[in-house]
């Protein structure tokens, strides 16, 4: 009986040791703001231990205004500007990409110039 209990305890310890203590979810921090006619487009994506690829696009309605791409491991920051935006128009920042080879849902941020 002691032998079986010890064996079960050993198996449980081995199983627990083989799983990570916690799995961190990816964090996304997008921002779209304007200074005069210049759009400031920003996204920070963090996922420890993973390769991140992303494309950040600035849209006005159905028109693609500008786009930028990048790749990183553990984190990726895209911080870009676009001049020539029109006052009163609404723009949308769209972020698409992959984390560890798996596509993440599109992230959007909307603001008016």
What is each of the regions a protein language model found here?
Residues 25-59:
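Short, surface-exposed binding/anchoring microloops in extracellular/periplasmic proteins
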Residues 38-42, 77-79, 106-108:
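Intrinsic-disorder/low-complexity, polar/charged segments enriched in Ser/Thr/Lys/Arg/Asp/Glu/Gln
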Residues 61-75, 109-111:
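Solvent-exposed serine/threonine-rich low-complexity stretches and specific carbohydrate-binding patches
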Residues 103-113:
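Short beta-strand elements
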């Amino acid at each position: 009986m002691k032998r079986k209990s010890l064996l079960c305890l050993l198996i449980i310890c081995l199983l627990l040791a083989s799983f990570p203590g916690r799995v961190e979810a990816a964090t996304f921090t997008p921002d779209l703001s304007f200074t005069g006619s210049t759009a400031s487009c920003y996204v920070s994506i963090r996922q420890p231990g993973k390769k991140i690829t992303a494309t950040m696009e600035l849209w006005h309605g159905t028109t693609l205004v500008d786009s930028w791409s990048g790749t990183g491991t553990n984190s990726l920051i895209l911080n870009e500007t676009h001049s020539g935006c029109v006052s009163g128009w609404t723009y949308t920042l769209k972020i698409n990409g992959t984390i560890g080879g798996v596509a993440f849902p599109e992230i959007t941020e909307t603001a008016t110039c």
